[in-house]
C-alpha cells in the first residue's frame, strides 16, 4: 500500500449523475515515489456495491541533469530506454532500443507515439504505460536536440 496521494474519504454522487470530479494531490515529500493507489467505491455504503479504480502516480525527477543541458545518449539511455530494452525484448524486432542510430532513424514515429496526442489510445507508447512523463520529456529532448527542461 502506497500513501502518497490525498483525496476525499467520501463523496456524494447524485442519482443520474454520469461523472464525478474530485481533487487528487500529491502528499509533500513523495514526488520521487511511483506506484498505484486504489480508490474503493461503494453505493450507499453497501459492500455489495463495491468496486475500485486505481490511480497511477509516476515519479517526478530531473534525473540529476541540470536544466538547459543538451541530452546525449549516455544521459538518456540508462534513464529511459534501457528498462524497456531489457523488459520488452520483442520490441527490438522493430526498433533496437539499445542502438542510438536506430533510435534516431525512428525519431519521428517515436516522437509521435509518445506524444500527448496519442494518450488514451492503443497507439500510445509504450503500450504498458511504464514511461513516466519525465522519461518521455528526456527522450523528447534527446530526439529533438532541445535543451532539457524537466516537467513541473
What is the predicted role of each segment?
Residues 1-152:
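Aromatic- and Gly/Pro-enriched helix-to-coil junctions and flexible linker segments
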